[in-house]
Amino acid sequence: MRIFIDDGSTNIKMMWEQDGETRTHISPNSFKRGWSATFGAGKPFNYVIDDEKYSYDLISPDVLPTNNVEWQYSPLNVLAVHHALLTSGIEPQEVEIVVTLPLAEFYDDDAQYNLANIERKKASLMRPVTLNKGNVFTIKKVTVRPESIPAGIGLCDNLNPAHSVLIVDLGGTTLDVSMVAGQMTAVSRVFGDSNLGVSLVTREVRQALARANTETSNYNVDQLIINRHDEDYLNDNINDPSAIGDVKKAIAASIDRLRTRVLDVISDFKGYTHVMVIGGGAPLVADAIREHVNIRDDRFFVADDPQLALVHGLKAIG
């Protein structure tokens, strides 16, 4: 079985064919050191990799950080991929996987394949993982693709070669921007910032939550950001009601900073005829990008499901 995986720092996004159907799965990344306790019917996911013990935990404030580029080659990345496979509904078996690297890692300074990083990623994902009292998948082959670029394949196929698409992929940790010619005849330019992503917002909001007596995991912080306009949700999940206003201000201010930095990057690109915005951070920045690029509406695209846009492209490439 061949499985297409966008192994981002915040979530693992998967797509595969099964029983004649295309299926998808999203698995948040949230791991801590040590094993979780067993109780009742609940089954903890307790893993061992490189002789170290880890467990999956969505709520602990002690979860290990994933918002750095070295995560791409870390034991946590391997665990995240295996955990997504194990929670996908697929029976453990031998699989081939297609994964991604941020543009700044996939390409070198001359915009050529960084073969050392690509091989490093492959070797990392081939490491053995064990699950306490359970079976795991055997990864028999790893293919590595760049982020951003594959997501534009559907749009580029319908454009003539004289046109070009600016593909803006904002993830949890990285911003990947590529300029691709119609029909995928050329990749004109790539840019990757490994320190610019939604985690900029997550970090600042987490600090505001700590001041509101609400220590929690990055997953729960991200859920607060997503539900920032839902007063009932905020009241239910922030321990100090008097601090809700401060948390909302922190969310708004950090999103504004994120938008400004993304627009600074986009301003350096010229000559594109179409724009496509993808990635988990797309809902936070798409409107600002639309206004900034001032391109006609029928040439500006936000993926219907921004988180899954890249795996759709990976599957289309094969």
Residue ranges and their predicted role:
Residues 1-167, 184-199, 219, 223-318:
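Nucleotide/phosphate-binding catalytic cleft detector across ATP-hydrolyzing
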Residues 181:
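A cytosolic small-molecule/anion-sensing beta-strand core signal
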Residues 176-178:
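A structural feature that tracks compact, well-ordered secondary-structure segments
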Residues 171, 200-201:
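Extended, H/D-rich, highly charged conserved domains that either
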